Amino acid sequence: MKCPFCGFEESKVVDSRSTDDNTTIRRRRECLKCNKRYTTYEKIEDFPILVIKKDLTRENFNKEKIINGLIIACQKRPISRKQIEEIAYDIEKTISNSMLTEIPSNEIGEMVMARLKELDEISYVRFASVYRQFKDIDTFLEEIKNLRT
């Protein structure tokens, strides 16, 4: 690491600790030439995940979109904001752990539906009706029938 004071390229780490959110490491360094101390930060490089939409356009993954969809589906149901945020976080983590740089939006929708199905059947049907674009009552009945089997 190049010293900001004298430009020498060798230093020693005097202190190292994680930041409060555990996403960054703060290091105190000492230049081996001029003995001055300075601080550096080390952070994991984030690679944006792109969502491939139905029309094949791409946009950055946005966890807030999942949260907003879940809030609407879970409205007036006994589901807390914390549960909704945990679902969104789990989906984001699953996608990140897959090491994919792009993911189709329908895969994200299926992940949301799988978690809602476990959590609350009413919220699941609400979400499915919008996500799968139900056209009539028969489609609702078919989804409910599938939910029961």
From Swiss-Prot:
GO biological process: negative regulation of DNA-templated transcription
GO-annotated molecular function: ATP binding; DNA binding; zinc ion binding
Keywords: ATP-binding, DNA-binding, Metal-binding, Nucleotide-binding, Repressor, Transcription, Transcription regulation, Zinc, Zinc-finger
Zn-finger region bounds: unnamed: 3-34
Family annotation (PROSITE patterns): ATP_CONE
Pfam family, one: Zn_ribbon_NrdR
Residue ranges occupied by any ATP-cone domain in the UniProt entry: 49-139
Cofactor(s) needed for function: Zn(2+)
Cofactor binding remark: Binds 1 zinc ion.
Highest taxon in the source lineage: Bacteria
InterPro entries: ATP-cone_dom, NrdR-like_N, RNR_NrdR-like
NCBIfam families tied to this protein: transcriptional regulator NrdR
Job of this protein: Negatively regulates transcription of bacterial ribonucleotide reductase nrd genes and operons by binding to NrdR-boxes.
Family under the similarity heading: Belongs to the NrdR family.
Name of the protein: Transcriptional repressor NrdR
Organism encoding this protein: Clostridium beijerinckii (strain ATCC 51743 / NCIMB 8052)
